[in-house]
Each structure stands twice: as structure tokens, then as C-alpha cells.
UniProtKB/Swiss-Prot annotation:
SUPFAM superfamilies: L9 N-domain-like, Ribosomal protein L9 C-domain
Source species of the chain: Shewanella woodyi (strain ATCC 51908 / MS32)
GO molecular function, one term: structural constituent of ribosome
Domain of life: Bacteria
UniProt GO BP: translation
Protein name: Large ribosomal subunit protein bL9
Length: 150
């Protein structure tokens, strides 16, 4: 099924690209989310008329994401206290939700889906740098300090 993308989508294309995708992906994800329209003559004309508006919306989203990334990078070390053993091994782990909640408590709104932990949850005390993907093109680094709870 051919669709016209209304947004930048990772591993697929940018705004205005006409791409071929599987019918289920288009019907179940792209079309309901408003990220694409079926590529036909009528939709192509409508898209060309709205192209400037959509590009302005993407630029505004990017500007907001860049501003949020600057706020996240400006944060001092975010401290998370958790119960730990004598050698600094945590009883449990610190995951995406815990990090997102701590950053939100520090004053910058952050969703758990934006936190990237490629090596999995944190299981020891110490200093960590956690990557946060605020937008498809914008990333930030959170300085995280995991300390043992009294």
C-alpha cells in the first residue's frame, strides 16, 4: 500500500515522502495516528496544499524538543535513592519509569518512553549518564546519581 507521510517516521521516511508499506502497518498504525494518508490523486493535492503548514508544525515541534533538551542538559545530577547492599548492589533495579519520575520531580517533564537504557536497568549505586531521546532528531544526557537509601 502506498502512503504519503505527514510526519518524520524513523526507518521509513520524512514529511512528504511517498512510501510503500504493508497494508496492516498502514491501516493499524500510520492512518489512525494521523502520520500518513493513502497515496491517491485527491490526497496528493490536499497534501501539497497543506505542505507548508505541516512543515511549520514539524519545525515548531523540533524547536520545543530542542528547548526541552537544553533544560534536561542544564540539570544538575539527579539523585535517586534506593535500598542497596554493602557492596553497592541494589535490592531491585532502577528502570525507565524511575528515571523519568526523578527528572520530572527535578522540574523537567519527561516520559518513560523517552529514556534510553541500552544495557538494561541500573542495578548498582554510582554515577551514570543516561541518554534521553526527546525527539527523533534531538537527544539529551541526564546525569544520574544512584545512592544507597538509609
Amino acid at each position: 500500500m502506498n502512503v504519503i507521510l505527514l510526519d518524520k517516521i524513523a526507518n521509513l521516511g520524512n514529511l512528504g515522502d511517498q512510501v510503500a508499506v504493508k497494508a496492516g502497518y498502514a491501516r493499524n498504525f500510520l492512518l489512525p495516528q494521523g502520520k500518513a494518508v493513502v497515496a491517491n490523486a485527491a490526497n496528493t493535492e490536499v497534501f501539497e496544499a497543506r505542505r507548508a503548514e505541516l512543515e511549520a508544525k514539524l519545525a515548531a515541534d523540533l524547536a520545543v524538543a530542542t528547548e526541552r533538551a537544553d533544560k534536561i542538559n542544564a540539570l544538575e545530577s539527579v539523585v535517586i535513592a534506593s535500598k542497596a547492599g554493602d557492596e553497592g548492589k541494589l535490592f531491585g533495579s532502577i528502570g525507565n519509569r524511575d528515571i523519568a519520575d526523578a527528572v520530572t520531580a527535578a522540574g523537567v517533564e519527561l516520559a518513560k518512553s523517552e529514556v534510553r537504557l541500552p544495557l538494561g536497568a541500573l542495578r548498582t549505586t554510582g554515577e551514570f549518564e543516561v541518554e534521553v531521546q526527546v525527539h527523533t532528531e534531538v537527544k539529551a544526557i541526564v546525569k544520574l546519581s544512584v545512592v544507597a537509601e538509609d
